[in-house]
From Swiss-Prot:
Keywords, alphabetical: Cytoplasm, Heme biosynthesis, Iron, Lyase, Metal-binding, Porphyrin biosynthesis
Catalytic activity entry: heme b + 2 H(+) = protoporphyrin IX + Fe(2+)
The enzyme's E.C. designation: 4.98.1.1
Protein name per its UniProtKB record: Ferrochelatase
Localization terms from the record: Cytoplasm
Reported function: Catalyzes the ferrous insertion into protoporphyrin IX.
GO annotation (BP), single: heme biosynthetic process
Entry superkingdom: Bacteria
Species assigned in the record: Prochlorococcus marinus (strain NATL1A)
Biological or metabolic pathway of the protein: Porphyrin-containing compound metabolism; protoheme biosynthesis; protoheme from protoporphyrin-IX: step 1/1
Keyword Iron found: yes
GO cellular component, one term: cytoplasm
Cysteine pairings via disulfide bonds: none
Amino acid sequence: MARVGVLLLNLGGPERIKDVGPFLYNLFSDPEIIRLPVRAFQKPLAWLISLLRSSKSQEAYRSIGGGSPLRRITEQQARELQSYLRNIGIDATTYVAMRYWHPFTESAVADMKADGVSEVVVLPLYPHFSISTSGSSFRELKRLKDSDDEFAELSIRCIRSWFDHPAYVSSMAELIKKQILACDLPQESHVFFTAHGVPKSYVEEAGDPYQDQIQNCSLLIIDQLENSLGFTNSFSLAYQSRVGPEEWLKPYTEEVLEKLGKSGVKELVVVPISFVSEHIETLQEIDIEYKEIAQKNGIVNFKRVPALDIYPLFIEGLADLVSSCLNGEGISLEEASKLPERVKLYPQEKWQWGWNNSSEVWNGRVAMIVFLCFLMELIIGGGPLHQIGLL
């Protein structure tokens, strides 16, 4: 009988203040996060960004207790999922693979091989696919498979996205409903979805399906919420966590909060739609930064829907995804790691320079300008990057 391993993919996060710099370096070394036309620029640029952003990021992590809870919560999710699977007759062992911090993907692969796993289900803890999240993790796993004959012999099936899974949609609707009913005027509360943003070029030029999946997911949740409540709440969607001067998906969360406040919204239910675990974006960015913006603009009652964490229906949904994958609904790792044809990442074909609409050309030129700005600011201790919020 095959030994089943369920590999949960997630971002990772620094558990201690001293981990912040190395974590940022790992993050920005990934070409799916910052796409450059020349590979040699990647690690020097990552080093500079991590050096210059460490202080600000450390301050943010101090405000939530000194480190990210993401590993602890993800491991709780893994234990709950393993227990649920075994209770329904699936003898599986769960493993956690973080992309940019411990436990790294290599460690999870080594553990699966040591345990004698022969069949692997790869489940990203990102409901919505993006080339910069699930795509990067799948691609890293594919790299390990290509370089490890023993790992390559395993049967590997993947779940690419699951934003429309009924249990996920229902879990979100249930948690939102609780916050709406806790408002003084439930029918007048505004439901505000905020998702992690990505550069606009990823969607418009690289063909990333992320924005479409976020929008469709929001509508599915709203439909279920209306059926459950029996009344309709106004709602909106925005994107957070923008970094650097490049245009990201709009509207931006902080700008929508200002508009909602000025339009007279007093009760706001904030939904972190792309996050299934509490971490820096929910605990610091939403709970502290965005709450302050909302209150400054007249929003009196700011309620934030908790992340799913180990919500029972959510765990049940993850188990159903695993079960379906084992029954043939998953896709191969090769298919899961395949990027849209318009995306160029390392290893790349010979680069063609020229004045055209390729996002990589422009990203490369911008990267060189930013690189020079970094060097200048290292010397003078200030400059334009402070003004645009990168430092």
